[in-house]
């Protein structure tokens, strides 16, 4: 198990991902009813409509430093398919909407489905935020002053010295027991070979 700070960083990363996914869902599947109706003026705008601008049918420009083979290959390749053609077929048009910039978007969810998914996404965000709050609350030193933390560090250093002393004593006892065992094994070995 990772330490608390690593868990906290992971939860923050997951929360950011959940925020992004929630925003993507909300912008993609809402009913897309404009808050204000579009202007109905008949005066043409200063910018020409994109549909009236002719498209270049030629291949993209190639730098002068490119080899001749690359130029001939790019000229031999067929032009990309024209995606500006309007969609035909009512069934396919019902499944996707055309946005002003021409991108196809999925059909919006029904209001009940959209509301249910909104609640689910909000609940997931709240749960992740509660996990983050819990991890922050269990971080050491949150509710103590600097002096209390220094006192606690000194206490822990004292406990560590005591434990290290006990460890050193056990290591010496182990050395004594090892020497005694070697002596017993030496006597047994001499006794076994002396009978032969």
UniProtKB/Swiss-Prot annotation:
Residue ranges of coiled coil: 144-174
Organism: Aspergillus niger (strain ATCC MYA-4892 / CBS 513.88 / FGSC A1513)
An example molecular function term from Gene Ontology annotations: transcription coregulator activity
Location relative to the cell: Nucleus
Keyword Translocase: no
Gene Ontology CC annotations of this record: mediator complex
Pfam families (UniProt xref): Med21 (PF11221)
Record carries keyword Kinase: no
Major subcellular location class: nucleus
Family membership noted in the UniProt record: Belongs to the Mediator complex subunit 21 family.
Classification via SUPFAM superfamilies: Mediator hinge subcomplex-like (SSF140718)
InterPro entries in UniProt: Med7/Med21-like, Mediator_Med21
Protein name (record): Mediator of RNA polymerase II transcription subunit 21
Chain spans, region Disordered: 52-111
Annotated keywords: Activator, Coiled coil, Nucleus, Transcription, Transcription regulation
Subunit structure of this chain's protein: Component of the Mediator complex.
Role according to the record: Component of the Mediator complex, a coactivator involved in the regulated transcription of nearly all RNA polymerase II-dependent genes. Mediator functions as a bridge to convey information from gene-specific regulatory proteins to the basal RNA polymerase II transcription machinery. Mediator is recruited to promoters by direct interactions with regulatory proteins and serves as a scaffold for the assembly of a functional preinitiation complex with RNA polymerase II and the general transcription factors.
GO biological process: regulation of transcription by RNA polymerase II
Comp. bias intervals (Low complexity): 65-76, 87-98
